[in-house]
Amino acid sequence: MRFRKDGVGKITPILVATPSDKVRNGPYVWPKGPYKHIQADKGRPETMMWSYVRKNGGRGFGFTGGHKHLNWGNDNFRKAVLNGLVWIAKAKVPKNGIKSSVSVEELKQNLDPKGKRK
């Protein structure tokens, strides 16, 4: 991720990791890479979850990890996102975070039917 550097607010990284060279080489993007500007950043940590505070006090929260639906079954995954939502609402985030639970059956409810992969 690239963020503005012109002082319009403050980005605070929450979740940062360094993608493998395999990821940088492009099979996980659409349209499929590789892309030179992505490969040029090999070894560079990437921010995947962040908070943002505007100069006027407004808050934002971003996360690039919502692509795999079953990840929502992970308690810590949900907790991080729920904590971010509570924080942007300027409510108090509990010391141990927002607790929630979801079953596999609940995760599978109301999913759109998928066609065959080509």
Q: How should these model regions be labeled?
A:
Residues 77-88:
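Short amphipathic C-terminal alpha-helix that caps PH/PH-like domains
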Residues 63:
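Phosphate-centric recognition/catalysis
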Residues 35-39, 66-75:
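Active-site rim elements
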Residues 54-58, 92-118:
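Long alpha-helical segments found as membrane-embedded helices
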Residues 1-56:
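Catalytic beta-strand/loop cores that center a nucleophilic Ser/Cys/Thr
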Residues 24-27, 72-76:
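Short conserved micro-motifs at the rims of enzyme active sites and ligand-binding pockets
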Residues 66, 89-92:
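Cell-envelope and extracellular/periplasmic
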Residues 58-59, 73:
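Extracellular low-complexity, Gly/Ser/Thr-rich intrinsically disordered linkers
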